[in-house]
Design a protein with these regions (language model features):
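Conserved ABC ATPase signature
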Residues: 135-139, 143
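Catalytic Walker B motif of ABC-type/P-loop ATPase nucleotide-binding domains
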Residues: 160-163
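Helix N-cap at the start of a conserved alpha-helix in ABC-type nucleotide-binding domains
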Residues: 171-173
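H-loop/switch region of ABC-family ATPase nucleotide-binding domains
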Residues: 196-197
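Conserved ABC ATPase "signature" region
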Residues: 64, 112-130
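Conserved catalytic motifs of ABC-family nucleotide-binding domains
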Residues: 156
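Helix-to-loop junction immediately C-terminal to a conserved catalytic motif
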Residues: 48
């Protein structure tokens, strides 16, 4: 579980986040939604440790991230999978090599085992062997997002953070990506946070939804309550 307790963040004396309180359960998909400038991106950056709040607590399964030592934060970050607004793939690497990249960096498995793991993750997002040898520039935007999801789950993360995962996608493909993230969350028991301004994403999210407005939590509920 991820818990936010009385988080505050300011830039140049202006409060961007004001007394944010929220909790995100394990094995659930959680949507953080708000207009551009609402503070949702700053909130996500605070949660993953890219920004440091001035006040409050950020708890990962009871551990206050803000109080951890540098090496402890590094170990915790290895339990995080990230999906960025752009797919952020390496253009010079094949689809398979993109997914193998974090495995090559952090896994002690043999090369064959790392390759099998990458292939398994790609097949889980419905990308079969023919696509594995292609390069990012040779596949569609929707397929690139699938590769990004496969790469994010390659190291079996406990937490999955998705920053505008539907950016640049048509509504039909966006819904497919939302449902894929949701299904993987439940399959692996991951705590997932999806950050977006797209109200259509609500249709693919079945758990908690938090609306951020002018740096505060304006509303919290489920899809059925929206």
């Amino acid at each position: 579980m991820i818990e936010l307790k009385h988080l505050y963040k300011s830039f140049d004396g202006k409060e961007v986040l004001k007394d944010i309180n929220a909790s995100f359960e394990n094995g659930k998909t959680n949507l953080i939604i708000g207009q551009s400038g609402s503070g949702k991106t700053v909130l996500m950056k605070c949660i993953v440790g890219l920004l440091t709040p001035e006040k409050g607590e950020l708890l990962y399964d009871g551990r206050n991230f803000l109080s951890l030592k540098k090496n402890e934060k590094k170990l915790l970050r290895r339990e995080m999978g990230m999906i960025f607004q752009s797919a952020a793939l390496f253009d010079s690497m094949s689809v398979l090599d993109n997914v193998m990249f974090p495995l090559n960096m952090f896994s002690n498995d043999t090369l064959n085992d790392r390759k099998r793991r990458a292939q398994f993750c790609l097949e889980r997002v419905n990308l079969t062997g023919e696509a594995h040898d292609k390069f990012p520039g040779e596949i569609s935007g929707g397929m690139q997002k699938r590769v990004a999801i496969a790469r994010a789950i390659a190291l079996n993360p406990q937490y999955l953070f998705c920053d505008e995962p539907n950016s640049g996608l048509d509504p039909k493909t966006s819904l497919v990506i939302d449902e894929l993230i949701h299904d993987i969350t439940h399959e692996y028991g991951i705590t997932t946070l999806v950050n977006t301004h797209d109200m259509n994403s609500v249709m693919g999210i079945r758990e908690k939804i938090i609306f951020i407005h002018e740096g505060t939590k304006a509303w919290e509920g489920t899809k059925d309550e929206v």
